[in-house]
Amino acid sequence: MVRQLLRRSILWMGVLVLGVALPASPAFGQRGAQNGEWRSYGGDAGSTKYSPLDAIDETNVQNLQVAWTWQSVDYDRQAEDPDVRFNSVLLATPLKVGNALFTSTNLGQAAAIDPVTGETLWVYNSLAEGTNAGRGRGTRGLAYWTDGSDERLLLVSGEHLVALGTRTGELYPEFGENGKVDLRQDMGPRLQRYAWNAAPLVCGDVVIVGAAMSDSPTRQEATPGYVRGYDVITGQLRWRFNPVPQPGQAGNETWEDGSWEYSGNANVWTLMSADEELGYVYLPVSTPTNDWYGGHRLGDNLFAESLVTLDCATGERVWHFQMVHHGLWDYDNPAAPILVDITVDGRPIKAVVQVTKQGFTYVFDRVTGEPVWPIVELAVPPSLVPGERASPTQPFPTWPLPFERQGITVNDLIDFTPELRAEAIEILGGYVFGPMFTPPSVRSDDPDETQGTIQLPGWVGGADWNGAAVDPETQILYVPSVTAPIVVALVAPDPDASDFNYVRGAPRSVQGPRGLPLVKPPWGRITAIDLNTGDHLWMVPNGEGIRDHEALQGLDLPKLGTPGRPAPLLTKTLLFIGEGSPSMLAMPRFAGGKMFRAYDKDTGEVLWEMELPAGTTGAPMTYMADGKQYIVVGIGEANRPAEFIALSLP
């Protein structure tokens, strides 16, 4: 049965309760990584990023040291052929199964690594097999499947899905054609090139993949962001979900004037989660074509910018909730939904949690799709762009409270000194600004008039692909986020180059006075939220932030927070997180740092920190090997090799 929540009642003032979570029978929920292993990108299929390991704890964490480093085997291919190029930002998080770590690389290779020494055990050579990633950016990792006797690794390598043996890295010949499935197939005639940089997800005997697509295409006609499920043994396509409903399908009416016929995107570019007990996969769906102007696709545009739940075996939609109607802000759902069992007012609930770029924490019953706390439709500003019609309302969770600053006013501007504040006010005056969901605006040709709309949070979040982590024992969620406004300035394109009425032009970022951020700190933060009550427990800046700017000299400033893309790792007693590599975040300026820290989960106090050779690029993970606990994370920068660094006690 498909649960439909297709259109909301409009609420101009007050509160509209969309649903109350139904009691759920107690069941074994998402418990994090088990048995000292790390079998999924997020530790488990529910993306908790949690391990109950406690050999490293608050009493000895200060003794952590580097155990080994592993340089990406992509450099071996480059040594063989100097023309080989790839990104030095290693996105992957390795899996730990049995006596090996398994990782993907930026050339679409895979490798097995000794978990104690960091020695390479085997390599799947994507260049030799003809499946390498053309732009050398790679994916965030692998998926692992076993039925208890057989086991295999699933990897998106360039435009192919491949199945590899865990012992040797050799292709399974019965999977697809000689071990490979061509992912360009079944994507429709509009596809020019397939790419994806997340990690496959296994649910039962199905491996599920999404797709990456341009946020700023030049044509209205685009490929829909199909999500596909393949048989893990044969590679046969089991199902294909189209996020743009076709005639006769629920939601098609939300694409006015036949815009469903040519519109695309609404893809899943990021990581997914699954409840294998229920047999459900949870899709964080992104924005439709294009991200900033929707005059050619009027309507709510289901199932874009929604959390969509599918049956893993059939691809049938079970329930959905749309977080943004008629998206104009690139507020796609950026992170894997998190599955956790909570208790609210005495009621056990099998929950799914979606953190967003807007700084919201949406919490639903993952069985029924009912919100755990009321979600209200509130009026938002209209669009003044010719041909555009913004949604009159957007859904706002009433609880938990936002974990990021939303919208921008004069009161949000930097105020370290009166001079800096005055300069910030002058800068703000050159733009349209207001509450969150203020639509994009057309840039004036007159430099003394508006130069676009300042959007906060921007397209970098709030939250992003690095997501959040949850402790399934305490039901406390830990969310890293950034405060980084952007500018959305629409311009009329050359009609020979684009058939859109408007596309996004320059400027795209806004600097504050003297190159400092425009808004008050913290610019990078961590927020702890009790999911049983929805209460915020603590918030701390992550990192010192800017310290050497000449305008700040002589000021007694607290920690300002380092904006970045660090992913969290939870253990029994500690929260580990870096600052993110500068290469992971193009804006704001001063983004990223090399510090890696352990926080007290109860208080947010920093218990330990280490300066790494480079900033973190992937999500950290932990495991046991030979009786010792290790923590491994990818690091790298533009001028430094991509590598893993492993930490352990002496």
Task: Specify the residue positions occupied by each region the protein language model found.
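Beta-propeller blade signature
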Residues: 169, 223-236, 300-315, 367-368, ...
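Structural motif
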Residues: 167, 218-224, 304, 360-362, ...
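Mature N-terminal segment immediately following signal peptide/propeptide cleavage
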Residues: 31-77, 96
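Phosphate/diphosphate-binding loops
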Residues: 336-385, 636, 646-649
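Repeat-blade elements of multi-bladed beta-propeller folds
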Residues: 38-42, 86-109, 134-161, 192-219, ...
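Bacterial N-terminal signal peptides
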Residues: 9-24
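Extracytoplasmic beta-rich repeat domains
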Residues: 70-93, 123-148, 177-199, 242-271, ...
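Loop/turn-rich, solvent-exposed surfaces of beta-rich toroidal or solenoidal domains
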Residues: 341, 515-527, 531-535, 539-544, ...
